């Protein structure tokens, strides 16, 4: 499949998606999000892909949603079409996904990064939810995911003032897992994805599911859910291989089944 707004490739067992609207600082529009949905579904369906990296350009991961596209909307149109509701598909990707963020990740761009499983940021990265300056609020999960990531006080600060925070503050706040030099960003993200993809795919996908459900369940429910997933992995060939390799002191050769 050819894409108008994305660059899509595979490197070994890693799927790499690069946002490619340089003239608009990778602003998110309907075409880009439809193409991103298609690319993610293709990678999810490809058994040869074990992890995904989502990247932007050096200047901007994504500078926000495309304001020109949404400017003329009214409430009825937006409500009936569930505007932005369909963009949640990114968070529903089943395989582990890493956001490699350089430059601006603002508004919808920050929300898109937060839909990934974790964020690796360049030292140049800038995060923020500046929707308040446009007379609106975050609409792609910013008020929800940001609060879960950094806590109420920091989320209120960022959302109510519209200010940006740099990569160092984002890492201290828990939004970002690692900060690296700009020239090492893609290498670091691909390296992490390659490591994840080298493990059992069923185990990696269940680990992702368990962590994500922890945000929705009570502790007792979450513990039961985790335990059932753990137990279910004993039905896989990879569990047998992983434990046999550990006992034999050799490297496991997972078959992803």
Curated annotation (Swiss-Prot):
InterPro entries: ClpP/crotonase-like_dom_sf, Enoyl-CoA_hyd/isom_CS, Enoyl-CoA_hydra/iso, Enoyl-CoA_hydra_C. SUPFAM superfamilies: ClpP/crotonase. It catalyses: a (3S)-3-hydroxyacyl-CoA = a (2E)-enoyl-CoA + H2O; a 4-saturated-(3S)-3-hydroxyacyl-CoA = a (3E)-enoyl-CoA + H2O. Keywords: Fatty acid metabolism, Lipid metabolism, Lyase. It holds the Pfam family ECH_1. CDD domains: crotonase-like (cd06558). GO terms for biological process: fatty acid beta-oxidation. Its EC number is 4.2.1.17. Belongs to the enoyl-CoA hydratase/isomerase family. NCBIfam families: PRK05862.1. Could possibly oxidize fatty acids using specific components. This is Probable enoyl-CoA hydratase. It comes from Rhizobium meliloti (strain 1021) (Ensifer meliloti). The lineage of its organism: Bacteria, Pseudomonadati, Pseudomonadota, Alphaproteobacteria, Hyphomicrobiales.
């Amino acid at each position: 499949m050819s894409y108008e707004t994305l660059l899509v490739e595979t490197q070994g067992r890693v799927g790499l998606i690069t946002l490619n609207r340089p003239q608009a600082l990778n602003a998110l529009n309907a075409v880009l999000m439809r193409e991103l949905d298609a690319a993610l579904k293709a990678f999810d369906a490809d058994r040869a892909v074990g992890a995904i990296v989502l990247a932007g350009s050096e200047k901007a991961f994504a500078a926000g949603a495309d304001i020109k596209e949404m400017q003329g909307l009214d409430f009825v149109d937006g409500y009936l079409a569930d505007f932005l509701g369909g963009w949640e598909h990114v968070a529903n990707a089943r395989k582990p996904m890493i956001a490699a963020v350089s430059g601006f990740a603002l508004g919808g761009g920050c929300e898109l990064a937060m839909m990934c499983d974790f964020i690796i940021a360049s030292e140049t990265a800038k995060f923020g939810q500046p929707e308040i300056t446009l007379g609106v609020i975050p609409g792609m999960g910013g008020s929800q995911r940001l609060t879960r990531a950094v806590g109420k006080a920091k989320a209120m600060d960022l959302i109510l003032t519209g200010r940006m925070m740099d990569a160092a503050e984002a890492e201290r706040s828990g939004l970002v897992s690692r900060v690296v030099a700009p020239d090492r960003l893609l290498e670091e993200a691909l390296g992490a994805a390659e490591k994840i993809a080298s493990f059992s795919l069923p185990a990696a996908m269940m680990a992702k599911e368990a962590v994500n459900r922890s945000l929705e369940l009570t502790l007792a429910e979450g513990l039961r859910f985790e335990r059932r997933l753990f137990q279910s992995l004993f039905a896989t060939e990879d569990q047998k291989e992983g434990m046999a390799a550990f006992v034999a002191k050799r490297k496991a050769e997972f078959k992803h089944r």
